[in-house]
Regions:
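Transmembrane helical bundles and short interhelical boundary loops of multi-pass, membrane-embedded
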Residues: 1-87, 91-94, 110-177, 189
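Generic transmembrane alpha-helix motif of multi-pass integral membrane proteins
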Residues: 101-110
């Protein structure tokens, strides 16, 4: 605890206000960069961070309701995985490469399939940030403006995992509909 004492500034150390102006390598950072010229730094930071927090809370509530209805032994793990992936891909304000470890533990608890593949893909893409994207855009001198970097880095990093997540969601929906259709046909024949 003593090692953290120099960083403690009272209860506001834990508040969201301190973090609402920190944006990097994420979709909210790209939104921040796009809105900055029209709204100004303070208002843009406040609005983007508030929208991200509200979206995260709504998604978590929806996933909690899904897990409550499902009641299988994997429902909590699945909902937790979906929430952490939603947060990292869509609403995380300040993304760092090591955050990609978070979903791996949950994916390991789920049956082989889309979750494990998404977690692995996300890990590879996150590792590409310092190995590919940063040299491509951040090694130039003078350094491009922060707004220019954020408009490109977040969407470039998150595009492939988001596309995969959407494809997995559509695939799951199609499979469920086919299964329900077969069950309905089987019940009608009986």
């Amino acid at each position: 605890m003593l090692f953290y004492a120099p960083f403690w500034q009272g209860v506001e150390t834990l508040s969201i206000e301190r973090r609402q102006a920190l944006f990097t390598a994420s979709l909210p950072a790209a939104a921040w960069a796009a809105l900055l010229p029209s709204l100004g730094k303070e208002l843009t930071s406040q609005r983007v961070s508030t929208v991200a927090a509200v979206l995260t809370a709504l998604f978590a509530l929806w996933q909690g309701a899904q897990a409550w209805r499902d009641r299988s032994w994997l429902s909590f793990t699945r909902a937790s995985f979906h929430i952490i992936m939603f947060y990292l891909l869509i609403t995380c304000l300040w993304f760092q490469s090591w955050y990609a470890i978070w979903p791996l533990g949950l994916a390991a608890l789920l049956p082989p399939g889309h979750a494990a593949r998404l977690a692995a893909l996300f890990g590879y893409v996150a590792l590409a940030k310092p190995l590919a994207f940063e040299p491509l855009w951040l090694w130039h001198r003078p350094l491009p403006p922060k707004e220019w970097r954020e408009l490109r880095l977040g969407p470039a990093l998150m595009a492939l995992p988001i596309v995969y997540a959407l494809m997995a969601w559509v695939d799951g929906k199609v499979r469920r509909e086919k299964r329900e259709s077969r069950e309905t046909e089987g019940n009608q024949e009986s």
